[in-house]
């Protein structure tokens, strides 16, 4: 994936995160339990944070930074995506997918750290 495409993906995911945050605050607040709403908000928070991390990875550039961005993308899909589906459908087994997204996030941060060290030493 090119840096430009990765940057665009990060920006789109941030925009979707803002939209989902507004949806949760206005449309779901009266329909969900406090626990489910908190779970939805966690999904939005992690999506926003990692969308920004994707933007940073795209700006840093290099193969490792792009890999980090892809890991963040996978993390958003698995972590936030599974939580959104869990909250909206009530299908409990989706919670088993969430930790895989967390692992992708952790790996992404590690790879981004290596990419940053390499870029700053150059």
Model-derived regions: residue spans:
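Polytopic transmembrane helical bundles with strong interfacial aromatic enrichment
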Residues: 1-122
